[in-house]
Amino acid sequence: MKVVSNFIFTILLTLNLSAALEVVTSRIDRGGIQGFHGDVKVHSGATWAILGTTLCSFFGGLEVEKGASLFIKSDNGPVLALNVALSTLVRPVINNGVISLNSKSSTSFSNFDIGGSSFTNNGEIYLDSSGLVKSTAYLYAREWTNNGLIVAYQNQKAAGNIAFGTAYQTITNNGQICLRHQDFVPATKIKGTGCVTADEDTWIKLGNTILSVEPTHNFYLKDSKSSLIVHAVSSNQTFTVHGFGNGNKLGLTLPLTGNRDHFRFEYYPDTGILQLRADALPQYFKIGKGYDSKLFRIVNSRGLKNAVTYDGPVPNNEIPAVCLIPCTNGPSAPESESDLNTPTTSSIETSSYSSAATESSVVSESSSAVDSLTSSSLSSKSESSDVVSSTTNIESSSTAIETTMNSESSTDAGSSSISQSESSSTAITSSSETSSSESMSASSTTASNTSIETDSGIVSQSESSSNALSSTEQSITSSPGQSTIYVNSTVTSTITSCDENKCTEDVVTIFTTVPCSTDCVPTTGDIPMSTSYTQRTVTSTITNCDEVSCSQDVVTYTTNVPHTTVDATTTTTTSTGGDNSTGGNESGSNHGPGNGSTEGSGNGSGAGSNEGSQSGPNNGSGSGSEGGSNNGSGSDSGSNNGSGSGSNNGSGSGSTEGSEGGSGSNEGSQSGSGSQPGPNEGSEGGSGSNEGSNHGSNEGSGSGSGSGSNNGSGSGSQSGSGSGSQSGSESGSNSGSNEGSNPGAGNGSNEGSGQGSGNGSEAGSGQGSGPNNGSGSGHNDGSGSGSNQGSNPGAGSGSGSESGSKAGSHSGSNEGAKTDSIEGFHTESKPGFNTGAHTDATVTGNSVANPVTTSTESDTTISVTVSITSYMTGFDGKPKPFTTVDVIPVPHSMPSNTTDSSSSVPTIDTNENGSSIVTGGKSILFGLIVSMVVLFM
């Protein structure tokens, strides 16, 4: 029976064989089996549709010209699928138009097998199947080039395969390959500047030991369910990946593991490279800049703890235009002869697309896709990058030192318990500067994070990042403030690892530092500074368990720990420029250390608004009736001069001078030149407001009238109470001018109106009520309260905002620059922290090669020891504490005429909790300033 079936099949196939076929005009062929012998060519402008077929074979080459279309579709119901075979080893396959193979309506296995001596696509190819069962699609040739668009689509995810090229050869892709619901496992090398886009739960597995992918080629993870997996046992490569984020995955074919020198994964923010490691086998992914190291997480990919995901949106990085060519479903096949009259066009050829995706607003392009695809010049913008070393040397001459402390416990899956402490190299540089307006600062932040992943093991690790210490000479003049010193603290944690039979425990000791703040007292003297090194050894235990037993390895790390010694002195100076300037300066400096320029300018203006709003209404109500009774007649004159002249003069003069003092906050924020410009500008604002006072009072008393009462009460009350208090609260300069004029007019009119009407009725005719109601109150309020109050708040708030903003902004900018220079590790910075206090320190001295001790016969020697801890990113990409740096200041000589010798030498005691504190009479304050300068270094 089988022989008979094969014979019938051969007969039917022979009946459909023909010689070389030239399709010049559009046509539709129907039938279950189609066979074509010889070369087939579809000419431009023609559409050829083969419908209702289950088997279509070509025994020769195939060429589809630009503007031509070839459709092969199975529409015989859901059972019979489409099988297309084009197998020739001596003739090429060339497509410059549209080829569509469609078996989406069937529920059975479909197979697309197209190959030739060479394969070239400059147009569009669509390979569509149902995905209900395993389907395959192969486009193979020894010479394989795609400059156009290839879309491989399944209705749903099945265990189908798609492959391009010939095994262990090279394919060139300069166009777009879209994979939707597919598994793609290339067995070839890949070169070119094109893109492979993974969409709708597509899984891509790349490479082995002899295959490579050029860094210029792009992979685009378009949705949150797609994955890119790289063979772990392979030569080190850098893969260019776009769209990583929102939960999609990058991984290796082996579980991610670290060793004593490297972590399981590391992200380098300066280069945008993510490194994944299976012990000694790393692979690199160029994912772009802007990722947060805290949002990376290790996950499973098909049963292995071998991938990393990112729990955040994709940063706005540039995506090449070739990756943004739309992955469309393609044009529909003509169903009847009437459909052939409508020319079939490419879905991309007739559309103008914008290449800006959700991840990028950089690339924007509108073009005819076929024209651009047929040209081999279509390229993506990409950059190749060398592998970045995980050891980073950092040089900095900044005067700010920031130490970031992270304490993290991460519980991870697996059958082993790993405890590690690691540190990378430390670079120490020194520079010399002299400045009268810059400040030295040291800040410390502490973060705690815990991440837990359920499985059979527990992993705890503590690591440290690169630390940069800089010693700097400066001459600074400031007032006494606060300093932060640190005492050493030891934290011990237990690591538990369990399998099915037993649990083991390891004890890990972590050294940290605890900050404590004290007031500093100014002293005088020189500052000799030096940096020395000692060697610190840290030992950790690594426990590995399999199904039968557990083994332990002891790893010892040796690091060079810097010890910095200094003597420090401070001097104090007082700001000049009048009482008002002094008050403003104090207000600004007290709040400036909190949040830099923002807090400093905000509090300065607050003082101005309170004084202005309080004084305005009191003076206005007190003089309303008096001015009204003195001035007699003149209705228009009294009202206009009372509210207009008093208000305008107070506002003009006070506002102009007051705003000059207030504008100091902007200059401080940009240059950080100090607090002295604030007081000077503030005092000018004071003199300006006195002019407003004189003009207001003269105009008010010069003309007053009965009719003026109506105007005084109406407009005066609205502008006085409403605008005065509002403007005062905004800033120092606005407070001075607006409160002076507005409260005067407002309160004056209210009081004048109330009393004037009563007196007017007793006195008789129109002149009686007019004088009482009008100009007296308006003018007196404008001149008395408005101008006087305008001058004082103007000067005070002006200098306050100037001082606060400058001190805060200078510190903030230095902090940010310091932390950003650390490459490849996660740090956190909080610019402006405690900068107000640190601007009060004054440091002078010279760097020396060795620690220096100064003393005389009548002097007493003191010393203080301080510790600083550094950190490094962990195996899970998050920072951990590791190295403690002991900082030992050089002994400083105290004057021999110290009255209390018993308190001149500080000592270091130990509390019950194991931490150290500095004690010892008056000298403890000097010890604290020494510690502050050490931290600045």
UniProtKB/Swiss-Prot annotation:
Membrane-protein topology: Lipid-anchor; GPI-anchor
A GO term from the CC aspect: fungal-type cell wall
Protein induction: Induced specifically in response to hyphal development.
Biased segments, Gly residues type: 591-609, 619-631, 641-665, 699-725, 743-801
Region called 7 X 4 AA repeats of N-E-G-S, residue ranges: 610-753
The keyword Secreted is annotated on this UniProt entry: yes
Composition bias type Polar residues, residue spans: 393-414, 841-851
Keyword entries, A-Z: Cell membrane, Cell wall, Glycoprotein, GPI-anchor, Lipoprotein, Membrane, Repeat, Secreted, Signal, Transmembrane, Transmembrane helix
Positions of Sequence repeats: 610-613, 666-669, 680-683, 690-693, 698-701, 738-741, 750-753
Lipidation residue positions, type GPI-anchor amidated asparagine: N913
Compartments it resides in: Cell membrane; Secreted, Cell wall
Glycosylation sites: 16, 236, 449, 488, 580, 585, 595, 603, 619, 631, 641, 649, 711, 747, 759, 773, 897, 913
Biased composition (Low complexity): 344-392, 415-475, 567-590, 666-682, 726-742, 802-814
Region span, Disordered: 332-483, 567-857
Maturation propeptide residues: 914-937
Chief subcellular location: membrane
Name recorded for this polypeptide: Hyphally-regulated protein
Protein encoded by which gene: HYR1
